[in-house]
Amino acid sequence: MMLVLRFANLYVEPMAIFLIFLNAFIWSSSFALSKSAMDAASPLFVTGSRMVLAGIVLFGLLLFKRESFRLPRQAVMPIVLLSVIGFYLTNVLEFIGLQGLSSSKACFIYGFSPFTAAFCSYVQLREVVTWKKLGGLSLGLVSYLVYLLFGGGEDVSEWGWQLGMPELLLIVATCLSSYGWTLLRKLERQCESLSITAINAYAMVIAGILSLAHSAITEVWNPLPVENPVLFLQSIGALVIFSNLICYNLFAKLLRSFSSTFLSFCNLVMPLFASFFGWLLLGESFPPGLLFAVGFMVLGCRLIYHEEFRQGYVLSSE
């Protein structure tokens, strides 16, 4: 993990772009791991446990590296806000919303995350959204629609297009997630004495405690809401390593050189990677719209990258 994070500090363009998609590639495995963990224990308990465990591990890394994690007074409220909005509420609303939605429809809603990230960056960081950037975002949305219409595993004609509570919850979760990432980027700029690792450690521990408290109120503890301890420990361990420790921290590191809009756009490839895993490992049919969708994604990615480089939001090196 530390080796990957060190590579993130290079920020040479080819390496940085490679790390962005490598991060999405690794993060896409968290869907299967989360499903496995949910089969072994209650969802809120799973979320709280992995957040607290990951936060403790990050604090341990800070102690090992002898880095300061002293919390400046001006950073207290932003970190609490990040913990509640970007970690706790995002995960809780996402879980509740997913219970009433098909995976393809949830995937479609998540496809709007670059637009919400662009809006949050405009409001919080005063980043300008140009027509060229909107064109790149639109190409990404087209690739998403192509993938869902021709490459998804479900018939989208069976979707109900009414806007119900599950849809609203997932839309809110998407917006809160984008807000959380832009808040993290703003916090890292304002509190230079506090590292990304320390910020994530505090946010994960606080969000984990809130999730466990929520679990204690709404889920049955007898003595713990775990049905399969071995599977639970295996799944939680893998989630902590791949999602919380590697992906969260690498994504946060990349925010130093790329906007949350660009990174959110690049993360649209995660469902495409999931389809690749299904074809390679499970023998599922290769989605016919996959290559077409990837082509649009690459074009949109280049448009946004060059526009943000011109605006000064993307840094080639530090």
Curated annotation (Swiss-Prot):
Compartments where found: Cell membrane
Keywords: Cell membrane, Membrane, Repeat, Transmembrane, Transmembrane helix, Transport
Transmembrane segments: 7-27, 44-64, 76-96, 105-125, 134-154, 163-183, 193-213, 231-251, 262-282, 285-305
Domain of life: Bacteria
GO cellular component entries: plasma membrane
Membrane protein topology class: Multi-pass membrane protein
Domain named EamA: residues: 25-148, 191-304
UniProt xrefs under Pfam families: EamA
InterPro entries to which the protein is assigned, alphabetical: AA-Vitamin_Transporters, EamA_dom
Alphabetical list of PANTHER family matching this protein: INNER MEMBRANE TRANSPORTER, S-ADENOSYLMETHIONINE_S-ADENOSYLHOMOCYSTEINE TRANSPORTER
The protein's role, per its UniProt record: Transports S-adenosylmethionine (SAM) and S-adenosylhomocysteine (SAH). Allows bacteria to acquire SAM from the eukaryotic host cell and to likely remove the toxic by-product SAH.
Family: Belongs to the drug/metabolite transporter (DMT) superfamily. 10 TMS drug/metabolite exporter (DME) (TC 2.A.7.3) family.
Protein name as catalogued: S-adenosylmethionine/S-adenosylhomocysteine transporter
Organism name: Chlamydia muridarum (strain MoPn / Nigg)
Native organism taxonomy: Bacteria, Pseudomonadati, Chlamydiota, Chlamydiia, Chlamydiales
